[in-house]
């Protein structure tokens, strides 16, 4: 959910000083602007979406860490061997085993929801942020 990503950015910012860039499709642009406003104390930008795949690939290639709930852009990041963090809902058809990225194992983390409601990640966001920091950003 938006709130989970906001909490994750806040918790990661407590651990390290990174610039956050929100990248989205045209349908989620307003949501990203709202998230940016809620995260105004952080160093954060929103990339205006285009329909240009080359632009999306370029944006992903420039990042240090790519966090996504959507496997399409996540697989692009994985194919570039970027550090990736994936979130998978608690559905038989959406497991990390099935949809894992092809980047080096040391460059990827995946979190699967353990709840029955597939809308939100049920894990502790503070713990996830610490895990991301310890395994991918330290």
Predicted regions and their residues:
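Donor-binding and catalytic core of enzymes assembling or modifying cell-surface/extracellular glycoconjugates
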Residues: 2-89
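Nucleotide-sugar donor-binding patch of glycosyltransferase catalytic domains
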Residues: 75-137
């Amino acid at each position: 959910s938006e709130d989970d990503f906001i909490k994750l950015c806040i918790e990661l910012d407590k651990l390290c000083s990174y610039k956050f860039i929100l990248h989205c499709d045209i349908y989620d642009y307003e949501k990203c602007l709202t998230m940016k406003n809620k995260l105004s104390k952080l160093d954060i930008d929103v990339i205006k979406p285009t329909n240009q795949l080359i632009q999306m690939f370029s944006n992903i290639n420039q990042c240090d860490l790519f966090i996504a709930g959507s496997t399409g852009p996540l697989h692009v990041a994985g194919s570039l061997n970027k550090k990736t963090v994936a979130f998978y809902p608690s559905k038989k058809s959406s497991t990390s085993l099935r949809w894992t990225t092809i980047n080096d194992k040391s460059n990827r983390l995946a979190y699967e929801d353990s709840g029955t409601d597939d809308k939100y990640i049920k894990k502790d966001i503070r713990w996830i942020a610490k895990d991301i920091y310890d395994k991918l950003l330290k």
